Amino acid sequence: MIFTKEPAHVFYVLVSAFRSNLCDEVNMSRHRHMVSTLRAAPGLYGSVESTDLTGCYREAISSAPTEEKTVRVRCKDKAQALNVARLACNEWEQDCVLVYKSQTHTAGLVYAKGIDGYKAERLPGSFQEVPKGAPLQGCFTIDEFGRRWQVQ
């Protein structure tokens, strides 16, 4: 666990509408539609902080991680984070979303299919910046400033 100077009790959700079995054109259309949906209801989902992230995730239908456009949403509470997860899982066929807490960067995967209930899996470690030159292994995120992040 790490401690930051970020505001307390904020959840960040990393979410994508991409699917590895779809072409780039379809994935970009899905990405734009998801961003519009999120921005249209900030009270429900929180605020879109960046649409310019690259995530490398492994989908259940894929044997290896794939890179995809990713959005960072700042949620004021757990309910908003769950709403983002539910949107991703129901509308965009996502396996889960990554949620991390603002001050400690503790992270977990959240799956919320259907209209109620959810599953959360806490990940060992915390969502941390990876130093330049250090290798990236497995799943990671590159933010809008080119910084590399990973749960470690």
UniProtKB/Swiss-Prot annotation:
GO terms for molecular function: S-adenosyl-L-methionine lyase activity; transferase activity. It catalyses: S-adenosyl-L-methionine = L-homoserine lactone + S-methyl-5'-thioadenosine. Keywords: Early protein, Host-virus interaction, Lyase, S-adenosyl-L-methionine, Transferase. Its EC number is 4.4.1.42. Induction: Expressed in the early phase of the viral replicative cycle. It is an enzyme of class 4 (lyase). Pfam families: S-AdoMet_lyase. Changing residue 68 to Q: 75% loss of enzymatic activity. Degrades the intracellular SAM pools of the host cell and inhibits the host S-adenosylmethionine synthase METK/MAT, thereby preventing methylation of the viral genome. Induces the polymerization of METK into filaments that are enzymatically inactive. Keeping the viral genome in an unmethylated state allows the phage to shift from a lytic infection under normal growth conditions to a transient lysogenic infection under glucose starvation, by blocking its own expression. Does not protect the virus immune against host restriction-modification systems. Homotetramer. Interacts with host METK; this interaction induces the polymerization of METK into filaments that are enzymatically inactive. This is S-Adenosylmethionine lyase.
